[in-house]
From Swiss-Prot:
Family to which this protein belongs: Belongs to the KptA/TPT1 family.
Coiled coil segments of this chain: none
Keyword set includes Lipoprotein: no
Alphabetized UniProt keyword annotations: NAD, Transferase
Transmembrane segments: none
One annotated GO biological process: tRNA splicing, via endonucleolytic cleavage and ligation
Broad enzyme group: transferase
Protein name (Swiss-Prot/TrEMBL): Probable RNA 2'-phosphotransferase
Functional summary from the UniProt entry: Removes the 2'-phosphate from RNA via an intermediate in which the phosphate is ADP-ribosylated by NAD followed by a presumed transesterification to release the RNA and generate ADP-ribose 1''-2''-cyclic phosphate (APPR>P). May function as an ADP-ribosylase.
GO molecular function, one term: tRNA 2'-phosphotransferase activity
Source superkingdom: Bacteria
Amino acid sequence: MAKYNEKELADTSKFLSFVLRHKPEAIGIVLDREGWADIDKLILCAQKAGKRLTRTLLDTVVATSDKKRFSYSSDGRCIRAVQGHSTSQVAISFAEKTPPQFLYHGTASRFLDEIKKQGLIAGERHYVHLSADEATARKVGARHGSPVILTVKAQEMAKRGIPFWQAENGVWLTSTVAVEFLEW
């Protein structure tokens, strides 16, 4: 595997997140309903848009991503963001899964007043993202400021018929979390 510096890997990961989750049209690619993009087309369109992207760089980003944000298709010809989409092109059909008793959501303290009013909502994304452990939730919350960890009564939600899904990178997904299922 070729050597790339951390900044190059981080910049490429951010670029891939942008085009594979949110704005594929920014470089002229189309994703299928499951979020897959043809790798050759992605590389070509990225290069036309002035972004240095190669298959080796893609392989390195996919292999070294601590959050496993991206995956390859079984034939190795396509790539997708595992979850976190806001583009209407994508509607990944995750298998419903029974959650553990509690899941966690990391946020910044400045968002608490709004969360106390309306619970957790997906916003521009398709799902609310939840973590199986507090440490991961804390890292997520720290990206937005002073982190606050909310405990989600996931099994109680599931018992009331609210579905959960789990992306292949371990992130738990649900449509919304009402205030009654949150512990501060």
